[in-house]
Amino acid sequence: MPSTVAPAIPAAAGLFAPRLRAMTVGSVALISLLAFEALAVGTAMPTVARSLDGLALYGIAFGGPFATGVLAMVVSGIWCDARGPRGPMWHGVAWFVVGLLIAGTAPVMSALVVGRAVQGFGSGLLSVALYVIVGQAYPQDLHRRIFAAFAAAWVVPSLVGPAIAGLIVQYLGWRWVFLAVPAVAVPAVLLIHPGLRSLGRSVATSPVAGAAARIGWACGAAVSAALLHIGGQQRGVTALVLIAVAVVGLLVCAPRLLPAGFLRAARGLPTVVGLRGLASAAFVGAEVVIPLMLSRERSLSPTAAGLVLTVGALAWSVGSWLQGRIPVPASRASLPRAGLTCITVGTATVALAVLPELPIMVAVLGWAVAGLGMGLLYPSLSVLTLELSAPGEQGRNSSSLQLGDNLFAATVLALTGAVLAAGSAPGPASYTLTLVMAAGLALLGALLAGRVVTGGSVRPVG
């Protein structure tokens, strides 16, 4: 088993202690850039497709980077465990930047699709490497705070990213949505570099066991994920066939990439990964329905419906901040259970807003509660993942956590799209069904939350 030597850093000094300051700023900046690019592309892509006459490749432009990201997460986990996070970090930034440059200078849509796929691979390498860096560079009692900072780094772009991207497209042109990001990504990773040098190299002398098989299963999962994403954007029989094939592929491949015992919610890490997937699926599945429901059933403008989502994002940030400041609960299950309970109650409350007799504030308050739950849950599950990982397992387990998140969310998004497209037009019944499904997933997670506790002592990180 590989081992690493982490530097001794006084936890009391906080995230901005002299030896952590640059790494904290650089890591949070990279997370923000990954989030901004993921959100900004959705705003820019209609203009891109028109400009490059590439509407036929529109779905692949989104499904491609999702698929390569799935593959990269597995590769990064193996690489981090075998050689430490420095290689995946540098290569991740390189692939991310090169992909953005290819996309930003693409003369035709097919070139942009290639750039997006390269960018997605870099994002997958980076996302796992950053988790491993947290496990090796930060003292354990700062993990809740750094993951809260990571959560905020995702939330802020969700508030301002689409608007900024729209302004860039309108006044500078769509290419700058891609070309502007490398100017910040390179300085951000340079800030992290000194801290990476102090982590020490892995002393592994042989490849991680089963690496080739994991990469093979990851390729299968990546293809299935791409089909799932593309199928979710189709209609009719085509959508059903693509989604069915993709789900079968994921059922075959994904369990080989997730912790043993995942499907039966075994205690410890398998349940941690499962809860992350259930929460992501519940939240994202509800999030895509809410604006449509409020605009069609309650006659809200797109701006007003979007503000409801903004309230949820702000509540997510508040929840992340709170979990990093409150005393460590006596039971490791407390924060995950509280978070999933909030998501359950909040999502079910939003479903009531389909009734015209109830005020719109029901939806606002419900989604705020759900967002608060996500803020309590996500960082706490990230912390648990590192606590349940020996040094040579941090990459694989961080990869599993993020894979579960992405694959669960993609599956529910595709199924939600199929439900909404089943009739001639979505109505109260379909909105209620999708929101109840989302609440049910969160409720299942809340009932399983006690199984994150292994019954034995939790391994320290580092």
Regions found by a protein language model. Give the residues of each.
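12-transmembrane solute porter fold
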Residues: L20-T43, F62-P65, L71-V75, R86, ...
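Structural signature of hydrophobic alpha-helical transmembrane segments
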Residues: F62-G64, G115-L125, R175-P187, A239-A246, ...
